[in-house]
A protein has these predicted regions:
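Structured, mid-chain assembly/scaffold modules that mediate subunit interfaces
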Residues: 143-242, 417, 447-456, 460, ...
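Long, charge-dense tracts
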Residues: 210, 214-319, 323
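Short linear, low-complexity motifs centered on an aromatic residue
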Residues: 193-208, 423-436, 644-651, 747-759
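Hydrophobic alpha-helical segments
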Residues: 748-824
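Low-complexity, small/polar and acidic-rich linker and loop segments
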Residues: 2-185, 205, 212
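Short low-complexity linker/loop segments enriched in small residues
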Residues: 641-761
Length: 824
């Protein structure tokens, strides 16, 4: 830059600039010159040299002004976020004090005392609204056979349409349009909270990179496979010139290191991934720009291991989490959270020196919860250990939980108990329940999904019973298939939809007849008033035109009814899109929290307790996950409903809640127990008499908050197989115990001349590991026609002894005797 230019710039800046600042300005001008030439070559050629320089300098000036304004705005947003948090923390009256208040800003707490929409609930509500707008995209990939496969032609057409290439496929075009609209909405909401994601016209869709597949090839191989698929115009030097092959290869080499190591090359000294200003996310994530749809698809085939739908959902979940974090804690959430944590911890410890230990423990729990929610987890230590552990756990889900539907009747108890506490109309809930249970009613399903309800099946989640997964595999497919084939997924979704629809209808009716939030009766609407709903949210809700869904649901307050409010009607309350989006999310967040209370789905707190926060690919992490396999659901039931009970305003209310919970779920557990016996070929048990205590203990274990412990403590597997300790340590430990016992028994049986006993033990082991063999509507037939006959072949008299033991120890007879191939 010439000296007179430097003087002019310094005069405009009203200060002396450093050599580095001057160089940056010069680079920015040259970069903009090349950017203009690349994007609009026709106009560029018609400009004189001075006009080109002026245009580029003008753009550079605008960029600098915009960056300065963004920096200033981020400071203001950080101050505003800190003020909101300080106000909530200082006004919180709970026994867990200010540290407890900070903890509640991170994840949902069921006791009804928070009055704050947590990061977890904000994330879920944002994600579920985004998913609700993507029905066309979901249909375009044509998920078949329980949603486990995607149609290749549909995927190809959708990717082409997302990249702006016409395919003539109307479904794919609508799906791509919906995707563009919802991702752009989320981009705007992120930027409104202080983010800085620019609009990239031909972005289309994010990429997924398989750490294992990329790590399995050399850096040179990966770079050579990728470099020819890229749109080179996006790869420029600092001065705006296009990178040459060597420079681009070096750039891609750094990307390779990050992908192949799972981020190990970007760790802090604590082992956590580096995380700067979260509001800057979105710029770095678009570093690989494919030149067209074919290049994208070819790359995903070579180095991806997820379906298109999983990639789309992953993007929505990621940006939803970022939005929730920057809205709650400001553009640099890590900094604000840690400064608050340090301050509150110091204040609490100073005020209560004798409780320093408990303060430290709560502070550590709070920090761990924040790290888990914000995704600041350690990379996978050993992908092979993690993958094998996943496969074992998924296989056990597929082979052991085929009858889990029969253990799920306790959902009815928690659902109606939650409805009572939330003041929902019971009769309407029952009507909606019947409608949702009708598998032929596609209208009900489409409406509920459009309202953002029960999105778990769209996510392909088996989270209710299983754990987190490394990625797609045969075992994961088998687990998902069994969950869907058993009817458990449909059961859970239907009841979630019924509860959510009832709550939205009830809220619509309450909003229409109540002038403002303060007019709500505290005793009837205590839970609703604990959701952090503001007067502005209530005012926006009243402006929404409610929907009539029929079947008594004629006052539906839905997310779409809020987002359809004309901008002119809410502009007096603030920026229209922001005001409507926040009111919509408060509605969906409140409903989602209560739906997950009514039909339990483990949340962040429960997942952290069951080992999800421990590093994957380590023996400690995988063993912990294995011990807690199947236990996340019963733990969630106990944690959430105990917390809700303890949050009741009076001692009488607490006692009544606990008594109702135990009584209702135990009675439904008894029903589950009887149905499970019938499905296994046994007659219903006597519920009275000398064995009554044993029966009702089993009912309590099966339904009354201890859930699947009943399956392990009182099931066939435990009665005749593994010991109670192995069962308590989880099904993986039980499997190891079975294998060890068989191995020990082989030489013993040979010495005693009972080698056929080993065959019988192997049959029993094989049956327990066969996916789908435990499906509630198949297991009696499979047992009697195949497995029992094999057992009798290897161990003559085994079935007779089993029948005698059942009569002696459990006073139980059979309607389909074990030795009969067909019922007699």
């Amino acid at each position: 830059m010439r000296q007179e230019c430097i003087q002019a710039v310094q005069q405009a800046a009203q200060r002396t600039l450093t050599a580095r600042e001057i160089q940056n300005i010069e680079d920015r001008i040259y970069r903009n010159m090349r950017s203009i030439a690349r994007d609009d070559p026709m106009s560029w050629r018609q400009l004189s040299e001075s006009e080109r320089l002026y245009r580029a300098a003008q753009l550079a000036s605008e960029e600098l002004q915009r960056e300065a304004a963004l920096k200033k705005r981020r400071v203001a947003l950080t101050i505003a976020a800190r003020q909101r948090l300080d106000k909530f923390i200082n006004s919180y009256q709970g026994a867990d004090g200010k540290l407890g208040a900070l903890n509640r800003t991170i994840a949902f707490n069921a006791d009804g005392k928070s009055n704050f929409l947590s990061v977890e609930s904000r994330t879920k509500a944002t994600r579920d609204y985004a998913l609700s707008q993507l029905q066309e995209a979901f249909e375009a990939v044509d998920p078949r056979f329980f949603g486990l496969f995607e149609d290749e032609a549909g995927v190809r057409d959708l990717v082409y349409e997302m990249r702006g290439q016409n395919t003539g496929n109307a479904k794919a075009r609508k799906g791509a349009k919906a995707w563009r609209e919802v991702t752009d909405l989320l981009r705007r909401r992120f930027n409104d909270a202080g983010g800085d994601i620019g609009y990239l016209e031909n972005w289309g869709i994010p990429q997924h990179h398989s750490m294992e597949k990329v790590g399995a090839v050399s850096k040179d191989k990966w770079v050579s496979d990728v470099i020819g698929k890229l749109d080179r115009k996006y790869y420029t030097r600092a001065d705006g010139q296009l990178m040459n092959d060597a420079e681009l290869s070096a750039f891609l080499g750094e990307a390779y290191n990050t992908i192949a190591t799972g981020g190990l090359n970007k760790l802090t000294d604590t082992g956590m991934r580096i995380s700067g200003v979260r509001a800057n996310r979105g710029n770095a994530s678009r570093q690989i720009h494919f030149k067209d749809a074919d290049s994208y698809l070819q790359y995903q085939q070579l180095y991806g291991d997820r379906s298109l739908w999983e990639i789309m959902v992953g993007h929505l979940e990621g940006i939803s989490k970022d939005i929730a974090l920057v809205e709650t804690y400001g553009p640099n959430p890590d900094h604000v959270f840690r400064s608050l944590l340090d301050q509150v911890k110091a204040e609490t410890a100073t005020a209560n020196p004798s409780k320093t230990g408990s303060v430290e423990r709560l502070a550590n729990k709070t920090e761990n919860l924040y790290n888990f929610i914000s995704g600041k987890t350690q990379p996978v230590a050993n992908p092979h250990i993690a993958r094998w552990s996943d496969n074992i756990r998924n296989w056990l889900v597929a082979s052991r939980l085929g009858s889990a539907l029969l253990s799920s009747f306790s959902d009815l108890g928690t659902m109606y108990l939650s409805a009572k506490v939330t003041n929902l109309p019971m009769n309407q809930l029952f009507r909606n329940q019947l409608e949702a249970m009708d598998p032929t009613n596609r209208t009900e399903l489409a409406r509920a999904r459009r309202a953002g309800l029960a999105m778990e099946s769209l996510l392909g989640s088996v989270n209710r019973w299983a754990m987190d997964n490394m990625g797609p595999s045969v075992s994961r497919w088998a687990a998902t298939a069994v969950m869907r084939a058993s009817g458990l997924t449909a059961w859970s979704d239907a009841h979630k939809r019924a509860y959510g629809v009832t709550m939205m209808g009830s809220l619509g009716e309450v909003v229409s007849r109540t002038p403002d939030l303060r007019s709500l009766d505290d005793s009837d609407f205590r839970i609703l008033k604990s959701k952090g709903i503001t007067d502005t949210d209530w005012s926006v809700w009243k402006l929404a035109q409610q929907e009539d869904w029929g079947n008594g649901n004629n006052t539906m307050l839905t997310p779409e009814s809020i987002m359809r409010i004309p901008d002119s009607a809410v502009k007096h309350l603030g920026e229209p899109e922001r005001v409507k989006f926040e009111a919509m999310r408060q509605l969906l967040g409140a409903v989602t929290e209560e739906v997950d209370m009514a039909v339990i789905t483990p949340g962040a707190r429960e997942q952290l307790i069951t080992g999800s926060g421990i590093q994957r690919g380590t023996w400690k992490g995988e063993l912990t996950r294995s011990v807690f396999l199947f236990k996340s659901f019963p733990i969630s039931v106990v944690m959430r409903h105990w917390s809700r009970a303890m949050g009741m305003p009076s001692a009488g209310g607490r006692a009544a809640y606990i008594a109702t919970f135990i009584a209702s779920t135990t009675i439904l557990g008894a029903l589950s127990q009887q149905l499970n016996d019938l499905a296994s070929g046994r007659n219903p048990r006597e519920m009275t008499g000398e064995d009554a205590a044993k029966f009702w203990l089993g009912a309590l274990l099966k339904g009354g908050g201890l859930g699947l412990y009943g399956d392990f403590l009182l099931s066939d597997h435990t009665r005749y197989g593994s010991g109670a300790l192995a069962s308590m340590l989880g099904p993986v430990a039980g499997l190891v115990d079975d294998v060890v016992k068989i191995a020990q028994g082989i030489p013993l049986n040979a010495v005693e001349g009972k080698s056929e006993q080993t065959g019988g033990d192997l049959v029993k082991l094989g049956k327990g590991l066969m996916p789908g063999a435990n499906l509630w509507y198949l297991k009696a037939a499979l047992d009697h026609m195949i497995f029992n006959q094999m057992q009798e072949y290897f161990s003559p008299g085994y079935l007779r002894k089993m029948e005698q033991r059942s009569k002696k120890e459990f006073n139980q007879t059979y309607w389909w005797r074990p030795q009969d191939v067909t019922p007699q």
